From Swiss-Prot:
GO cellular component: nucleus
Gene designation: phqG
Family in the record: Belongs to the NmrA-type oxidoreductase family.
Phylogenetic classification of the source organism: Eukaryota, Fungi, Dikarya, Ascomycota, Pezizomycotina
Domain of life: Eukaryota
Pfam families given in the database record: NmrA
Species: Penicillium fellutanum
Keyword field: Alkaloid metabolism, NADP, Oxidoreductase
Protein name: NmrA-like family domain-containing oxidoreductase phqG
Function according to Swiss-Prot or TrEMBL: NmrA-like family domain-containing oxidoreductase; part of the gene cluster that mediates the biosynthesis of paraherquamide, a fungal indole alkaloid that belongs to a family of natural products containing a characteristic bicyclo[2.2.2]diazaoctane core. The first steps in the biosynthesis of paraherquamide is the production of the beta-methyl-proline precursor from L-isoleucine. They require oxidation of a terminally hydroxylated L-isoleucine to the corresponding aldehyde by enzymes which have still to be identified.
GO molecular function annotation: oxidoreductase activity
């Protein structure tokens, strides 16, 4: 009898939105070919315990500690890496950056003998605008990607995420767009989605971290060499702002409409980084033809194929989530205050 040896896939950032989605998807493989290991700074956290309850192994390590990280990666066949570029600890000019953290994690994976790496990267807005605009969270990840490409892994696959549907659970994001989809107009009861012109054809790529990102990464790990050095776009749906509002009505029955703001500057500053970066993104999109992925045109074909592969491996049917389906589920969660 042949005993199948499980492939150890270690997830750095495994208690975050991206990492936990990847861990859950891999653990759902019908043949259980993956042993999922999650690196966390706090194994006693509720999020760590939740992912462990599904069958993941927890390992405590600090991303900046080469020894701890090398031990955490020991025996790993594959690694998924996502760092939190919004972490305030990585924002000080006097301290380490998200680039420093990403490089440290990649160096540890290489030292541990990891073969296959999937890295959650970012588009270079600086390159796309010929140096006119810099968004640190994207730029540092882009440069970590370039570093990882040169490290000589058996396969290295950068993945670019579309805008997250789950941002509609984040109050500062919702506030920037007139309260959509949760805050109705007091006079009419309808919800209004207000944004500046997106640019290009007006259709923006979005991804559900919860529903699709993990499956897309799962699909890569099913055939990693096929995606070596391939920039994978993680997109659930490419859709106009008008149709986002229409999808909400179709999902909930609540009247919603889209209202285009005159300019990117119509998004008023309020002292938060979220609001400032949102303004910048809409300036960029308008001036770069609506290209969310910066120098790369949007292409959903790879995401569709990877999702299909993952679902087949899990004995599930279906495909990438639509905003209509996502809003239907999100409204229930919102009403339950989850």
């Amino acid at each position: 009898m042949t005993i199948q040896v499980k492939r150890v896939v270690t997830v750095f950032g495994g208690t975050g939105n991206q990492g936990s989605s990847v861990a859950r998807s891999l653990l759902a493989h019908k043949a259980k070919i993956f042993h999922v290991r999650v690196i966390t700074r706090d194994p006693q956290s509720d999020k760590a315990k939740a992912i462990a309850s599904l069958g993941a192994e927890l390992v405590q390590a600090d991303g900046f500690n080469l020894g701890e990280m090398t031990n955490a990666f020991a025996g790993s066949w594959g690694v998924f890496i996502n760092t939190n570029s919004d972490d305030e600890a990585l924002k000080s000019l006097d301290g380490p950056s998200d680039y420093d953290l990403g490089v440290s994690v990649i160096d540890s994976a290489k030292k541990a003998g990891v073969q296959h790496v999937v890295y959650s990267s970012g588009p270079s807005i600086t390159n796309a605008t010929k140096g006119r605009m810099h968004l640190e969270g994207f730029e540092t990840k882009y440069h970590v990607e370039q570093y990882g490409r040169r490290k000589g892994f058996t396969s290295f696959t950068p993945i670019l995420c579309a805008s997250f549907m789950e941002c509609f659970f984040y109050d500062p994001f919702v506030d920037a767009f007139g309260g959509f989809p949760w805050i109705p107009e007091p006079e009419t009861g309808e919800v209004v989605f207000r944004t500046p012109d997106y640019g290009g054809k007006g259709d923006m790529p979005w991804v559900s971290c919860e529903e699709d990102l993990g499956d897309i990464v799962h699909g890569i790990f099913l055939n990693p060499c096929k995606y070596d050095q391939v920039l994978v776009q993680a997109t659930s749906q490419q859709i106009t702002m008008f149709d986002v509002a229409a999808s909400y009505t179709q999902a909930t029955g609540i009247p919603a409409r889209y209202e285009e703001l005159p300019s990117w500057s119509s998004i008023k500053l309020n002292g938060t980084r979220c609001r400032a970066e949102t303004r910048q993104m809409f300036w960029y999109m308008k001036h770069c033809g609506g290209r969310w992925f910066a120098e790369h045109e949007s292409d959903m074909s790879t995401a569709v194929a990877l999702k299909e592969s993952a679902m087949l491996s899990q004995d599930r049917v279906g495909g990438l989530v639509t905003f209509q389906a996502w809003f239907k589920k999100a409204k229930v969660l919102k009403d339950q205050n989850v």
